[in-house]
């Protein structure tokens, strides 16, 4: 399971670098990867900030006790807006395709975060590191990416097919 998560799912981000350069890619293949990393990490931080500022209602208390509905919804909205406004600068997405990505990617990031939290709890790893205060370790930085990378890749293929 760990091999699939780390190699297969995260491999989608690396595969984006093989996208041929085109005038339809505003920032090139590297821009596609940068945008994925930007919105995934922004979503994590936005959920954390909204949760700390407004969080009252736990969303998954047994798996991730610090996650709240307020953090989830605030992060989802903030990240969706970031995708909507910054997406055209980095991707060939527009209109309906961009809207789908703006709605779906923050949801996938949250799902990846909660799923990896559940896996860590199952194997008895409570905290992976204290390297980034308030954010845990490397696994905590990449957990959302395990779900956002394949989704982003396939949504790009679906909505921008023939556009890059």
Model-assigned labels for residue ranges:
Residues 1-47, 51-61, 68-164:
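Hydrophobic alpha-helical transmembrane segments
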């Amino acid at each position: 399971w760990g091999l699939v998560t780390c190699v297969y799912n995260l491999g989608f981000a690396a595969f984006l670098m093989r996208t041929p350069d085109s005038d339809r890619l505003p920032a090139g293949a590297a821009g596609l990867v940068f945008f994925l990393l930007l919105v995934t990490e922004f979503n994590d931080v936005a959920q954390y900030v909204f949760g700390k500022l407004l969080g009252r209602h736990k969303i998954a208390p047994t798996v991730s006790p610090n996650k709240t509905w307020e953090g989830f919804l605030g992060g989802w909205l903030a990240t969706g807006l970031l995708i909507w406004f910054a997406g055209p600068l980095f991707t060939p997405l527009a209109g309906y395709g961009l809207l789908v990505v703006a709605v779906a990617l923050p949801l996938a990031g949250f799902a990846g975060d909660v799923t990896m939290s559940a896996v860590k709890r199952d194997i008895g790893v409570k905290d992976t590191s204290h390297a980034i205060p308030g954010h845990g370790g490397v696994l905590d930085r990449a957990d959302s990416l395990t779900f956002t990378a394949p989704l982003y890749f396939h949504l790009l293929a679906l909505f921008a097919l023939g556009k890059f």
